[in-house]
Amino acid sequence: MRMLLKVKIPTEQGNRAVKDGSLGKMLEATVGKLKAEAAYFIAEDGLRCALIFFDMKDSAQMPAIAEPLFIGLDAKLEFLPAMNADDLRKGLPASM
C-alpha cells in the first residue's frame, strides 16, 4: 500500500543533526531504505519536515522505519495511507 511518512523534526535536534552532519545522512538512508516513490522537504509549524511516499508491504515494517528517526532525531511521525489519481479513479466507483 502506498504510504506517506510524515517526519517532523524538533528544532533543537534538527539543529544538532545539521551541525554534526547526521541529518542529511539519516534522511538519505531513510529514503533509500524505503525505495521512496518521492520525497519532499518542507517547513511546517516552524519545524523541518519530510514527506516521504513509499510502498509499505507489511505493517511490521513500521518499527524498523520509525525507531531510527525516533532515536536519532526525536522525530514525530505519521504513517498515512495515500492514493494517486489512478487509485482514486479505481476506488470511487466502489463507493457508490
Name the predicted role of every residue range:
Residues 1-96:
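Conserved, structured core segments of small domains
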